[in-house]
Regions:
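Conserved class I S-adenosyl-L-methionine
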Residues: 2-47
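Class I SAM-dependent methyltransferase SAM/SAH-binding core
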Residues: 54-106
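A conserved beta-strand element that flanks and buttresses the S-adenosyl-L-methionine
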Residues: 118-119
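A short glycine-rich, Lys/Arg-flanked "PGG" loop and its adjoining helix->strand segment in the class I
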Residues: 132-144
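Conserved beta-strand signature within the Rossmann-like core of class I S-adenosyl-L-methionine
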Residues: 146-152
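Acceptor-substrate binding/catalytic loop of class I
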Residues: 165-183
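Conserved S-adenosyl-L-methionine
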Residues: 193-204
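Core SAM-dependent methyltransferase catalytic element
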Residues: 206-228
Length: 228
C-alpha cells in the first residue's frame, strides 16, 4: 500500500478550510494579544525602516497586514503559502504586502535577500528532517545580522507527530509535528546564530483545538544570524 503524503494532504486541507480559518481568526485581534504584541514589538524594534521581511506560511496574511499597516517603518513584506485559497484572502487582507504561491520546501528567492524571516505555525506541518532543510534555506535567504522568528507547538510528554482530523473541520486531516526548544537551540547554535528571545505561549483558544491538541503549548524563538 502506498504511503500517504501527509504534507500534501495537509496542504489540501488548508485549501478546503479557509472559511472556517477566517471565521476563527477574525475574532482574534492580534494587536490585542499581549503575548503576540510582546514578540512582534521586539521584532519591530530590531529592524530598520524599509526592511525586507519574509512571512513563510502566511495563511490569510495577518502578520503582513500588521507589519505594513500598524507600524510606521515602511517595511517591505512578502508572504508565501502553498494554499491558493488562503493567498486569495491574504491579498485582500493585506493590500500593502506582496504574496506568492510558494512552498517553504522549495523557496526560490535570492540569497541574502531578507532582513527578517518570520515563520509562525508552519513548521508544525513538516517532519524534523524537512524542518532542518527549511532552516538551512532560511539561513541562505537571511542577510548577515538578519533576524529569524519561529513559532511552533511544543512537545513535552505528548505524542510528537500526529495525523488527525482537522480541528476546524474534521472532514479533513492535518499533520502536526511538535518540537522541543532544544531542537532549535541546537540548530541555531551550530549555525552561527545568537538566540535573543524565547517566549512560551498559550494557544489562542484550546476549545477550538480538539482533544488531540488540548494542553499543547507553543513557543517562539527569535535568533540573529552572525557573520561566518
Amino acid at each position: 500500500m502506498m504511503e500517504i503524503d501527509k504534507i500534501k494532504v495537509t496542504i489540501e486541507t488548508y485549501n478546503n478550510i479557509v472559511e472556517e480559518y477566517v471565521d476563527y481568526y477574525k475574532s482574534k485581534d492580534l494587536k490585542g494579544n499581549v503575548q503576540f504584541q510582546k514578540e512582534i514589538d521586539y521584532l519591530i524594534s530590531q529592524l530598520n525602516k524599509n526592511a525586507m521581511i519574509l512571512d513563510a506560511g502566511t495563511a490569510i496574511g495577518d502578520y503582513p497586514k500588521f507589519l505594513t499597516e500598524k507600524c510606521d517603518k515602511n517595511f517591505n513584506v512578502i508572504g508565501i503559502d502553498t494554499s491558493e485559497n488562503m493567498l486569495r484572502k491574504a491579498i485582500k487582507n493585506a493590500p500593502k504586502a506582496k504574496f506568492k504561491l510558494m512552498d517553504i520546501r522549495n523557496i526560490t528567492f535570492d540569497k541574502d535577500n531578507f532582513d527578517a524571516i518570520i515563520c509562525f505555525a508552519t513548521l508544525i506541518h513538516v517532519d524534523d528532517k524537512t524542518c532542518l532543510r527549511v532552516l538551512d534555506k532560511f539561513s541562505e535567504l537571511l542577510k548577515d545580522k538578519g533576524i529569524i522568528a519561529i513559532n511552533v507547538m511544543e512537545c513535552n510528554n505528548e505524542e510528537k507527530e500526529i495525523f488527525i482530523p482537522e480541528p476546524f473541520n474534521p472532514k479533513y486531516k492535518t499533520y502536526f509535528n511538535r518540537y522541543s526548544k532544544q531542537f532549535f537551540s541546537d540548530y541555531f547554535t551550530a549555525n552561527n546564530y545568537t538566540i535573543e528571545k524565547i517566549y512560551d505561549n498559550k494557544m489562542f483558544d484550546e476549545s477550538a483545538l480538539g482533544e488531540n491538541l488540548v494542553g499543547t503549548n507553543e513557543f517562539t524563538i527569535i535568533a540573529r544570524k552572525s557573520k561566518f
